[in-house]
């Protein structure tokens, strides 16, 4: 697996499962771009490869990780491929635990940051996506990153206030 120890990933998956609070059996599949694209198309209706997919069951579940994307991201972000795969395993475990970063108002992001620090892992998927979006927004607005973050936080707080007043 391109210099990544299966035993090391298996030990990490067991530890991440406990820390994420996932009971039952969890299987982790390390696969290639073509296979993960087929899974993504079949189960999510998206005909493109992705880095990680999670399939929860009543207890436990399955996680599929694309080794090709993991290696490319590791190169891109300057850390070992094993670290990238661990980030993906942790992300998948949190989905199996019921977290959903698309709908949970930052709960998954907070939990992932806490566990990443505890496990000494690099930036999370959520964090990288937000950093990239922030850079793109900054390029469009010309604002420095610190101002964009402050503006984003202010906008988020404004939305929360509006939601409370509607109820």
Where are the language model's segments positioned?
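An acidic/histidine-cluster motif and surrounding catalytic segment
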Residues: 1-85, 94-167
């Amino acid at each position: 697996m391109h210099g990544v120890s299966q035993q090391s990933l298996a030990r990490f998956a067991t530890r991440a499962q406990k820390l994420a609070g996932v009971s039952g059996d969890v299987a982790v599949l390390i696969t290639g771009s073509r296979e993960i694209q087929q899974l993504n198309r079949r189960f999510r209706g998206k005909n493109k490869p992705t880095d990680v997919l999670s399939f929860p069951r009543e207890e436990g579940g399955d996680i599929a990780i694309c080794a090709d994307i993991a290696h490319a991201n590791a190169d891109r972000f300057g850390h070992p491929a094993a670290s990238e795969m661990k980030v993906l395993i942790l992300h998948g475990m949190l989905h199996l635990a019921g977290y959903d970063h698309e709908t949970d108002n930052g709960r998954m992001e907070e939990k992932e940051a806490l566990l990443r620090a505890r496990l000494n892992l690099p930036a999370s998927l959520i964090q990288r996506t937000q950093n990239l979006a922030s850079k793109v927004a900054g390029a469009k607005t010309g604002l420095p990153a610190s101002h964009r973050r402050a503006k984003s936080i202010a906008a988020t707080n404004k939305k929360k206030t509006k939601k409370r007043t509607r109820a």
